[in-house]
Amino acid sequence: MFILTMGLNHHTAPIDIREKLVFKETEEEMALVTLLQEKSILENVIISTCNRTEIVAVVDQIHTGRYYLKRFMANWFQMDMEKIEPYLFFHEEAEAVNHLYKVTAGLDSLVLGETQILGQVKHAFEIAKQTGTTGTLLNKLFREVVTFAKKVHHHTKINENAVSVSYAAVEVAKKLYGSLDNKKIVLIGAGEMSELALQNLAGSGIADITIINRTKSNAEILAHQFQAKVGAYENMSDHLLEADIVLVSTSAEEPIIKQVAMQELMEQKASSMLVIDIGLPRNVEHDCSYIPNFHLYDIDDLAGVVSANSLERQRIVQELENTIETEVRSFFEWEKQLGVVPVIRALREKALDMQEVTMTSLENKLPGLTEREYIQIGKHMKSIINQMLKQPISELKEMSVEENADTSIEHFKRIFGLTETDVAIIEKEQAETRS
């Protein structure tokens, strides 16, 4: 079994490609199950956010796994494989695990150290686990990765001033206007990204914020939390006419702000307007950027305007990368030890069989034993067996991660009289349990 990651992100694909390759939240479970039915795919988790679509999979062979991951992607999004392929990246084994650690800790994000991705990775894993597309390897890997990322954000300063892409959006507004005092802001959308934007706007001197959402009750909840106003969705044009800054982040699959309508609106508007589109797919038609005084930024534009990270943060990143290397080695040592689990179980079962034979012999030779005495003897005998096996099992685990591990394990089986049949029975039971 091998760990293989395939995906595209803000490093490899522009937004006009990424927005076509986003898994809808309502279709996540179906996508996971469909992928699991592909040849070579044994486990899978799909991570789909505004900046990345990545599949982490366990495959039986790297070469066939790569092909079937690409085929699934092309079929799911109804695109030619040749059109998608130039934007895809693949990471195998240690490189794949290393990449997942960096992604989850926010080291691969548009905004270094952002925390939102941790929740997104955790959610992706939980959905896959509930759907039944994860197994021994990915369950272990994602638990370790999430735990590590939590420690990173708790014990380092990597996430200072870096909450999410929403943070970058607010920084753009500050760079353009300097002070945001007395600016009128309209937020379109009442989801997580809008909430994060409001958190970043807090303390910026803005007193006039209007939230517009198709479902008005969601806007009202957010407005109450941040002392903002609620605008009617059907009156969006009126609110845009008065706005200085507009942040747009909805789950709409088609643009809700269109070039023709904005051209007419801007002809009536006396001042310029900054529009930051952090939706994916994009919520604002790209042609709006050609309208005079209509300053449009999308997610990719944000990368070029966020200030460079300080030397201190770069130092922390270097330290984290070194720590991640240690975590990756630890994971693969654990994986190697998985290979000796059937041997350990076979050894324990052989010892328990010997105990059972001995207890039966005792019962026949000492018919006067009470039930309590018989049980106590059995407990003590089991304790002796466990103590005697503790050191050999520990040594076996150590052997499994050393050079010539296969030869050492074969010697171990010969010493304890374990046959290939003994081990094969356990391996078959494990395979049936996983399936």
Curated annotation (Swiss-Prot):
This is Glutamyl-tRNA reductase. The record marks H99 as: Important for activity. Keywords: NADP, Oxidoreductase, Porphyrin biosynthesis. NCBIfam families: hemA. PROSITE patterns: GLUTR (PS00747). The active site is at C50. Homodimer. GO terms for biological process: protoporphyrinogen IX biosynthetic process. Belongs to the glutamyl-tRNA reductase family. Pathway: Porphyrin-containing compound metabolism; protoporphyrin-IX biosynthesis; 5-aminolevulinate from L-glutamyl-tRNA(Glu): step 1/2. GO terms for molecular function: glutamyl-tRNA reductase activity; NADP binding. Gene3D superfamilies: Glutamyl-tRNA reductase, N-terminal domain, NAD(P)-binding Rossmann-like Domain. SUPFAM superfamilies: Glutamyl tRNA-reductase catalytic, N-terminal domain, Glutamyl tRNA-reductase dimerization domain, NAD(P)-binding Rossmann-fold domains. Substrate binds at T49, C50, N51, R52, S109, E114, T115, Q116, Q120. Catalyzes the NADPH-dependent reduction of glutamyl-tRNA(Glu) to glutamate 1-semialdehyde (GSA). During catalysis, the active site Cys acts as a nucleophile attacking the alpha-carbonyl group of tRNA-bound glutamate with the formation of a thioester intermediate between enzyme and glutamate, and the concomitant release of tRNA(Glu). The thioester intermediate is finally reduced by direct hydride transfer from NADPH, to form the product GSA. Possesses an unusual extended V-shaped dimeric structure with each monomer consisting of three distinct domains arranged along a curved 'spinal' alpha-helix. The N-terminal catalytic domain specifically recognizes the glutamate moiety of the substrate. The second domain is the NADPH-binding domain, and the third C-terminal domain is responsible for dimerization. NADP(+) binds at G189, A190, G191, E192, M193, S194. Its EC number is 1.2.1.70. It comes from Listeria innocua serovar 6a (strain ATCC BAA-680 / CLIP 11262). The keyword NADP applies. It catalyses: (S)-4-amino-5-oxopentanoate + tRNA(Glu) + NADP(+) = L-glutamyl-tRNA(Glu) + NADPH + H(+).
